[in-house]
Structures are given as C-alpha cells and as structure tokens.
Amino acid sequence: MVDTVIPGDMACLDADLLQLQEMSSFVLNSKPGFTQKLFDQWLSLPEAQRQVGSLLKDAVAGAPINVTGSASGSNSATIPSMFPAGSAPPLSPRSCGSPRTTKQRAPSNLGSTLKVVNEPVKEPIPQFYFQNGRPPPSEIKEQCMFRINHFFYGHMDGLQIQEFKLVTREICKLPSFFSTSLFRKIDLNNTGFVTRDAFIDFWVNGNMLIMDTTTQIFKILKQKDQSFIVKDDFKPLLKELLATHPGLEFLQSTPEFQERYAETVTYRIFYYINRSGNGRITFRELKRGNLIDAMLHADEEEDINKVLRYFSYEHFYVIYCKFWELDTDHDFLIDKENLMRYGNHALTYRIVDRIFSQVARKFTSKVEGKMGYEDFVYFILAEEDKSSVPSLEYWFKCIDLDANGIITRNEMQFFYEEQLHRMECMAQEAVLFEDILCQMIDMIGPENESHITLHDLKGSKLSGNVFNILFNLNKFMAFETRDPFLIRQERENPTLTDWDRFAHREYIRLSMEEDVEDASNGSAEVWDDSSLEAPF
C-alpha cells in the first residue's frame, strides 16, 4: 500500500458505485464479506493505488476532480478490474425463462466510484481580541522605544519620582501633575524607582501607548480592582498640582487652605461629571465630560485662575468665603437659618425647606438638620449656574413635590405664592400667578402645556429664569427689570457661564472688602495685583 491515508468514510464499499462489467451489483450486495475481500484486492493493485492517491491529492488541493467515463467507454480501463484475466467467477444464474429478471444495465459514469468530499481549504483566522487592546503599529512602537531609551539612558537602577516627571510629559503626553499617580501604578513594590523594563512593560506591552488620553487617565486614576473613580483617587493628583503649579505656590505656607482647595476642586468635578450622583465616576461619564481638557489646560496655563473649569483658585475663594459668611459659629456646618441669609435673603422658606429635606441630594454631613461644606458646594453651583444640566436636575427635584417626574401648575403656584407675598410686603408691583404662568410656559415651550418635564427644561435656554421666578426674589426682580449691567456682561462674554460671571463679580467684591478691612485695621500695605491671588 502507498502512504496515502484514506479516510474511513471514503473506504466504505458501495457495490452499485463500482460499476463492474464482470459482476452484477446483486451478487456483490448479497455477499458483503466476499465483496469486501474483492474490494481490498482491487485496492491493493498498484494502478488502483495511483488512481486513488491522485484523486485524494486533487481533493486536498481543492482542484476539480475529473474521472468521468463509463464502463463501456474508452476510459473504462482507467480503473483496473479486480480480477486477473479469465479468473472471474461465474455469475449467479437468473430465474430460468423469466423475462422480468432480465435487466439491461445502462452505462454509468466512473466518476462516482469513490465519494471524495471536496472540502475548502481552511484559512487561519487572524486574532481579533486582545486583552489589553490591539498592539501598537511597529513604527509607533519603535519611535516610543527610542524616546524611552533616551530618557532612561544612564539610569541603570531606574528613575526616581522627580526625574520621572519628564517621562510623564514627554513620552506619555499626560499632565505633569499625573507623575506621582503614574509612578505609583508602575512601582508596585514601593522601591522608589521605576526601571526602563518596568515602564516598557506597563506603557508599551500594556498597550497604554495607543490608548486615547481619556482611557489612559481613567486607568491611572482608578484602583486596580475597580471599574470607577472615587474622590480619594484625586488626592495624589491634586497634591502634586498644589506642590508644582506656579499659580498655586502662594498656598504652600497655608496647608489648611491647600486641603480646602483640593476638596473644592474634587466636589466640583463630581458635581458636573458624576451624573449618576453615586460618588463613582465611570469611564463613560469621564469621556462625556470636559475634565480631561481642563486638566490639560491647567498643566499648560501658569495663571490657574484662567482655568475656569474646576481648577480656578478665584472660584474656590468665592465658594469658601460664601460658606464662611453663613457659618457664623464656624463649626463647618450650616442650618436652615444660616442658608436663609444666602444672597441677601434671596431664597424663600419653602425652597430652603426642600433643600434640607434632601430630595435633590442626600447631605454628606451626617448631622441632622445641618449642611456640610460639600453639600454647600453642590448648592451654590446649582443656585448660581442654573443653565447647567446638574442645576436643572437639582431644582427640578425640589419643585416636583410628589416626585412623579412632572412639574404641574399647582406645584409652581405653591412656590410662587411666597414670592408674591414677599413682593407685596416690599411694596413691589406684584405679578399675578396667571400672568407669570403664561410667561414661564412661553419661555419653556413644553410638549404638553399642562405640565413641565425635565426634558422640556433641558431643551430651553431660559429654564434658569423659571426657577428664579419661583424661589429667588432678587434674581426674579433683576429678570423683570432686565438689569442692563447683567445684559452687558452676557454680551461682552458670551462664552462664560452664569457661574463664571457670578464668581468673577463676587471675587472682586470680596477682595475689595478684605482690602478695606485691612486698611481699617492699619495693616494695609501698598495694594497690587498679587493681593488678589493670595487672599489668605
């Protein structure tokens, strides 16, 4: 036998397919054991082996198999007879004289002698799943390796954290204040060094190299076994920012205010980014927000007050001072009566009650009837930036008394009644609720005029005015009189938010008050711009 291996299903004998002139298929089928011996004898012939081997090679190669012919045709000799000449056994006789037993056999093709399955050639499927992402292209990897070798040259023991800052900025293209967080991600054993091989394993082999900036930052900030970012994850980041940013150097002598600044930045980040409000920033929330751009801006801009999103020191100063003004006993907690004094008694009792009922947001102070600093940060951002989505959601929950997802006429009237009463007490011209209701409906343009949904509010640029009408008398009167100062501010700086404009006005006011106080105490020095940057 030749080396050709015939699969089992191809070596099974089908007598009808043999198409032998010497013997009928009836005889072959009636004696399977005898027939199998004949088949084995035929398969042992050299010519049969060559024929079968050729067919198998064609089948494996995917080539068309052409063995057509008939037993009586010229190609019948291509497959040899099972028996030597003159040695064929006699045929079994038919029933005598019965014409019905006589059967003329029609010629048939020899091509189906063996059932050869023409299977397609299997092509290898390229890898499509990579646990750490698709590897970087060789060109990008080579460029990165060249830069890595340059920065680690001469540092056989690795780089220390101060030396690692250049790697963070120049190779990783991340803000420099990420250096400590990135360093700790690689130096898992706290050796104080990051070697070349360890950095390559984390940044290149871990495919951090080709990830987008948002993914890189998310992986660096979050804990290894978590799929989200919590407040504590920002601590090393902000600690390094305070230690290295030129616009925050003046705070290094007052560590207590460094801590307050870091807390305020973190609260602002979670207020705008963590839309679920569960204290856990997901990758999707991080990607949808503007935090990454703000971080890159903070790293490039020496004047931290120009980084209006999250990091402005002036914004922190305003928030902290406003809280300090209300916290008369300075226990870092404020109650309802304290909050009623906010904005020169601008808020109604009814809205303050709703705030302290914690329907908009659960307080973190853990003290009954008291609002902590974090709670106040959420409140002031919601109150002074009513054009933002977090603010609309905050106040919608307060006005929606039955929490059924819509604000009805009765709910709006409930809050406006106190506004109306206050206007009458101040001898102001009162605006009837029916008139103001039509005005609010015109501003919002709800899908159903019988009620207002959160979706309706998010679709209107005037939604903040509706809330001012309902519970902030000072802003309501300013809106009614169309304060020319506010209108001019909006036209001069159309890109600024309501919060940006408020914080700027308040910072100037607070700075001037402090300057006057210093002068009255006889401690005023020659005033310059630097005093605005170092109020503490």
UniProtKB/Swiss-Prot annotation:
<feature type="binding site">
    <location>
        <position position="400"/>
    </location>
    <ligand>
        <name>Ca(2+)</name>
    </ligand>
</feature>
<feature type="region of interest" description="Disordered">
    <location>
        <begin position="69"/>
        <end position="108"/>
    </location>
</feature>
<dbReference type="InterPro" id="IPR011992">
    <property type="entry name" value="EF-hand-dom_pair"/>
</dbReference>
<comment type="function">
    <text>Regulatory subunit of type 2A protein phosphatase. Involved in post-transcriptional regulation of HMGR but not in root growth regulation in response to salt.</text>
</comment>
<keyword id="KW-0106">Calcium</keyword>
<feature type="binding site">
    <location>
        <position position="402"/>
    </location>
    <ligand>
        <name>Ca(2+)</name>
    </ligand>
</feature>
<dbReference type="InterPro" id="IPR041534">
    <property type="entry name" value="EF-hand_13"/>
</dbReference>
<feature type="compositionally biased region" description="Polar residues">
    <location>
        <begin position="69"/>
        <end position="79"/>
    </location>
</feature>
<dbReference type="Pfam" id="PF17958">
    <property type="entry name" value="EF-hand_13"/>
</dbReference>
<dbReference type="Pfam" id="PF13499">
    <property type="entry name" value="EF-hand_7"/>
</dbReference>
<feature type="domain" description="EF-hand 3">
    <location>
        <begin position="387"/>
        <end position="422"/>
    </location>
</feature>
<comment type="subunit">
    <text>PP2A consists of a common heterodimeric core enzyme, composed of a 36 kDa catalytic subunit (subunit C) and a 65 kDa constant regulatory subunit (PR65 or subunit A), that associates with a variety of regulatory subunits. Proteins that associate with the core dimer include three families of regulatory subunits B (the R2/B/PR55/B55, R3/B''/PR72/PR130/PR59 and R5/B'/B56 families) and cell signaling molecules. Interacts with HMGR1L and HMGR1S (via N-terminus), but not with HMG2. Interacts with PP2AA1.</text>
</comment>
<keyword id="KW-0479">Metal-binding</keyword>
<dbReference type="InterPro" id="IPR002048">
    <property type="entry name" value="EF_hand_dom"/>
</dbReference>
<feature type="region of interest" description="Disordered">
    <location>
        <begin position="517"/>
        <end position="536"/>
    </location>
</feature>
<dbReference type="InterPro" id="IPR018247">
    <property type="entry name" value="EF_Hand_1_Ca_BS"/>
</dbReference>
<feature type="domain" description="EF-hand 1">
    <location>
        <begin position="174"/>
        <end position="209"/>
    </location>
</feature>
<protein>
    <recommendedName>
        <fullName>Serine/threonine protein phosphatase 2A regulatory subunit B''beta</fullName>
    </recommendedName>
</protein>
<feature type="compositionally biased region" description="Polar residues">
    <location>
        <begin position="98"/>
        <end position="108"/>
    </location>
</feature>
<dbReference type="GO" id="GO:0005509">
    <property type="term" value="F:calcium ion binding"/>
</dbReference>
<feature type="domain" description="EF-hand 2">
    <location>
        <begin position="261"/>
        <end position="296"/>
    </location>
</feature>
<feature type="binding site">
    <location>
        <position position="404"/>
    </location>
    <ligand>
        <name>Ca(2+)</name>
    </ligand>
</feature>
<feature type="compositionally biased region" description="Acidic residues">
    <location>
        <begin position="526"/>
        <end position="536"/>
    </location>
</feature>
<keyword id="KW-0677">Repeat</keyword>
<feature type="binding site">
    <location>
        <position position="411"/>
    </location>
    <ligand>
        <name>Ca(2+)</name>
    </ligand>
</feature>
